[in-house]
Structures are given as C-alpha cells and as structure tokens.
C-alpha cells in the first residue's frame, strides 16, 4: 500500500514538473541564425505565436526563420491538406529578433493569425476567394484582389488592407479594427459588435448590423441598408 502511495506521489510530481515546463516561457540563447525549411505546396496559412511574418511569391515553397537556435527549435512547421502551420510549442519571452519569411509558389486564399503574429504581404494576393481570420493581438497588412472576400476579426486584432473585392462579408467583435480606406468594396455585408471599428471604401451597397459601440467609417456613396443598435455609429467621409 505504501509503495502504491509513493508511485502516486511520484506520478503527481512528474506531472507537476511537466506542467510547469509547458507553462514556462523560452528566452533567447546563443547567436542569431537563419534556418531554411522546404515545405510542400500550400494555399492557406495558420500562424500562432509572437513573431513577424513576411510573405512573398517565389519559385519554391520555403520557410526561412531568423532568430535564436532555441527559439527556432520551439517552432512546429508543417503542411497538411494545403495548410502551412507555424506554431510555437511554448510562449517566448524577451526575444528581440524573431522574423519568418514565407515564400510560396501559389497565391494564398486563406490566412489565420492568432496570438501576436504580425504579417506583411509583398505584392498582391490574387485569388477568386479570400478569407482572413484574426484574433488575439495579431496584425495583417497587405494588398488583396479577390471577387469574394470574408474577414473575421476578434479581440484586439488589427488589419490594414489595400486592393479590391466585389463582395465582402465582414464580422468584427471585441475591439478589433480594420482601417482600409483604399480597400475598394463593391458590396459590404457586416456584423460588428462590442467596440469594433471599420473604415472601408464602399461603392454599391452596404447592409448588416452594427451593435453596442461599434463604428463604421465609409468612403463613397453606397446604398445604405445598415441597422444600428445601441450606441453604434456610421460616418461618411471623403478621401483627401
């Protein structure tokens, strides 16, 4: 009976140690290195962590990571079903240099960012349908040209988009913000809640619902079919 108690205590102790290790943050060690990883074809990105990402079209599918050796080893990089996932196993702390460059043969049609990922797109993303999902403190900056677009943002995420789309389905929550006066939208369908805010250039029609203290600034002279609730606001401005 005593032996069984000792085994149980040992198991609980090991479990506690593993939990503490998983919760502890990784601090940089060693010298900054560049590690290149060749990956399979992808058209979707799923990125989670505290790093900056630069995406560009290229002749090969490659992920180039420039950071400290132990920080690099903390990353999971894999492609499954056309989705390139880059994710941290443990959170990082005080990493002063942590950049990832992604080269892809194909245009992206879906991007998902979470935690504190900051992503910049070189050139333009051209695709029949584009989806963007942001949460946490993530940020997206880039040009998008797509007949159909879907953007979902929550928490403190932020987006700055250029380009054009015929139909945009936009869902905002919490304090998410998209300020894109040079993103030309023909038709907008929006659901905005909490304290979210948006700024878009709309040509033909805008419809949907704004709730709580959410705010929409629009440029252009579209047909307005919006429903405002609570203290939500809609403002028309002219581009300077």
What are these model-derived regions, one by one?
Residues 11-21:
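Bacterial N-terminal signal peptides
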Residues 2, 8, 22-74, 83-103, ...:
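Short acidic/polar N-terminal linker immediately downstream of export determinants
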Residues 1-4, 16:
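Structured catalytic/translocation cores of nucleotide/phosphate-coupled proteins
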Residues 5-8, 12, 210:
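Intrinsically disordered, low-complexity Ser/Thr/Pro-rich tracts
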Residues 43-55, 101-102, 107-239:
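Extended, compositionally simple hydrophobic/Ser/Thr-rich segments
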